[in-house]
Amino acid sequence: MVLLVVDAQNGIVDERLYEFRKFVGNIKKLIGAAREQGIEVIYVQHDDGPDTGFSIGDDEFEVYSEFQPMPDEKRFIKSVCSAFKKESGLLEYLTAKEEKDVMICGIMTDFCINATVEAGFEHGLLMIVPAYANSTQDNEYMTREQAYHYYNEFLWPERYADCVPMDRALELLKK
């Protein structure tokens, strides 16, 4: 198993996210438990391209201060919603390691987390989604709360991912 931390970057990790404090606390718990158990923590960062303010070298691009990677932890860069798009190299990396179980956390529930969950499933990976370890902001169609519940409680379970309570996620990291 690996823990995949998706797009938890300075420019978008803030109070606009649904259940912000719970989200931050849960990701910190997951990262801590994974490291304690020797489970690889992998970071994915979204790059909107040069001169956008959200690209390599920009403060907004950097991983959120409370989730900082260790020097030896892998980082993959993407420019589309799915972390498994060929350009990132993530799928090839996991395939080479023969890794099939991916616990995912990060943002945005309705964009990059959804795309990565569905793509991971399509590539034969077991995607595990801990409760309140992904989040999003309001959009013109749904509130952040509606979006969170739609994906975590309706779309993903029994289709694309194992959506598990936080205590179960922590147990899985200890196996």
Language-model regions: role of each:
Residues 9, 47-48, 81, 108:
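Catalytic metal-binding/acid-base residues of hydrolase active sites
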Residues 11, 49, 135-136:
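Active-site loop signature of alpha/beta-hydrolase-fold enzymes
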